[in-house]
Swiss-Prot record:
InterPro entries: Glycosyl_transferase_4, PNAcMuramoyl-5peptid_Trfase, PNAcMuramoyl-5peptid_Trfase_CS. The keyword Transferase applies. This is Phospho-N-acetylmuramoyl-pentapeptide-transferase. One of its GO terms (molecular function) is metal ion binding. Keywords: Cell cycle, Cell division, Cell inner membrane, Cell membrane, Cell shape, Cell wall biogenesis/degradation, Magnesium, Membrane, Metal-binding, Peptidoglycan synthesis, Transferase, Transmembrane, Transmembrane helix. CDD domains: GT_MraY. Its main location: membrane. Its cofactor is Mg(2+). It catalyses: UDP-N-acetyl-alpha-D-muramoyl-L-alanyl-gamma-D-glutamyl-meso-2,6-diaminopimeloyl-D-alanyl-D-alanine + di-trans,octa-cis-undecaprenyl phosphate = di-trans,octa-cis-undecaprenyl diphospho-N-acetyl-alpha-D-muramoyl-L-alanyl-D-glutamyl-meso-2,6-diaminopimeloyl-D-alanyl-D-alanine + UMP. It comes from the Bacteria. Its EC number is 2.7.8.13. NCBIfam families: mraY (TIGR00445). Pathway: Cell wall biogenesis; peptidoglycan biosynthesis.
Length: 366
């Protein structure tokens, strides 16, 4: 919204700064962090009163988790407030990529909010029907992908079929045109990203820091992919307009820093599905927009690992009656093996940093 002040630059030279994505990204980060810091305490107090017993604790979980009983959830509301308000202020709202990303973020956040509401009111870990939830997520994601695909096709970026194509790391010219099946592929990527972050969010601070790390990595990717000069130098595909997504990702980092202040152990609040689904969906949408869906598997490798541990556990148990892990997702497995919560969290953060660096290295290895 504030980018429109550039029109006043002839009279007020300061407004020239609003042209630059880097300036607006930094401003979005600061704004979202400030929003969460200022309104976080009041929101936590309100949620604690309204929820009473807070988020239900799994009966079969690690014994150390029972001391967390009574901690309020739905902290994703403060994260979403920071991201959305900051993005509305600093991002270019005429960009279909910005609008699509905010659509997914708010849509997934609403689904997560309803899921959290059911869990809190029923005091059960069984919330929204899994099939119904996935179906609605897929519809929202597919709509966003369709509009982003049309935008890329209309721009004629890197060829007339680029918008409907999948690109591959390490190969600068290799693309697979899926046609309108790309909508299904992109929808799957976004839904998968949302639910992967959701599965990771099981310990204080475990999900939010890797989300910020992935956001920083994809913020750089979005900026480079949206800049013709940098994209040509790195020999990555130029996607006009995606640079604006760096502003939203800056807002994610700021909101994440603000939330971590309250989510640091012992957590005063959990983000809940409200936050984890929204954040994962946001990152997935950026990956689709910038044509780095496969690179997301590397950068978000921690989330992939958590998801695979659940899939393997369920599949093997149904097939043999035995479990591969002591408990899934895998962060609980390490808790059961004797790791303290802080050891699991910090070691997983380290893994997230390493994977982000490996993912970013693919930009040059072509």
């Amino acid at each position: 919204m504030l980018i429109w002040l550039v029109e006043l630059a002839d009279h007020f030279q300061f407004f020239n700064l609003f042209r630059y994505i880097t300036f607006r990204t930094g401003a979005a980060l600061f704004t979202s962090a400030l929003i969460v810091f200022l309104f976080g305490p009041a929101m936590i107090a309100s949620l604690r009163i309204r929820q009473g017993k807070g988020q239900p604790i799994r009966a079969d979980g690690p014994q150390t988790h029972f001391k967390k009983a009574g901690t309020p959830t739905m902290g994703g509301l403060m994260i979403l407030a920071g991201i959305v308000v900051s993005s509305l202020l600093w991002a270019d709202l005429s960009s279909i990529y910005v609008v699509s990303t905010l659509l997914v973020t708010l849509g997934f956040g609403a689904i997560g909010f309803y899921d959290d509401y059911l869990k809190v009111t029923k005091q059960s870990d069984k919330g929204f029907s899994g099939k119904a939830r996935l179906g609605i997520e897929f519809v929202i994601a597919s709509i966003a992908v369709f509009f982003m695909m049309q935008a890329a096709l209309s721009a004629g970026a890197a060829g007339s079929t680029f918008g409907s194509s999948v690109t591959f790391p390490f190969f600068k010219d290799l693309m697979l045109n899926l046609g309108y099946f790309f909508v299904l592929f992109g929808g799957f990527v976004i839904v998968g990203a949302g639910n992967s972050v959701n599965l990771t969010d099981g310990l204080d601070g475990l999900a939010i820091v890797p989300v910020m790390i992935a956001s920083a990595a994809f913020g750089l990717i979005a900026y480079l992919a949206g800049n013709a000069v940098f994209a040509n130098y790195l020999q990555i595909h130029f996607v006009p307009g995606t640079g604006e997504l760096a502003v939203i990702l800056g807002a994610v980092i700021g909101a994440g820093l603000g939330f971590l202040w309250f989510n640091a152990p012992p957590a005063a609040i959990f983000m809940g599905d409200t936050g984890s689904l929204a954040l994962g969906g946001l990152i997935g949408t950026v990956a689709v927009a910038t044509k780095h869906e496969i690179v997301m598997v590397i950068i978000g490798g921690l989330f992939v690992m958590e998801t695979l541990s659940v899939i393997i556990q369920v599949f093997w148990f149904k097939r043999t009656g035995h479990r591969v892990f002591l408990m899934a997702p895998i962060h609980h497995h390490f808790e059961k093996k004797g790791w303290t919560e802080s050891q699991v969290v910090i070691r997983f953060w380290i893994i997230a940093v390493i994977l982000a660096m490996v993912g970013l290295s693919t930009l040059k290895l072509r």
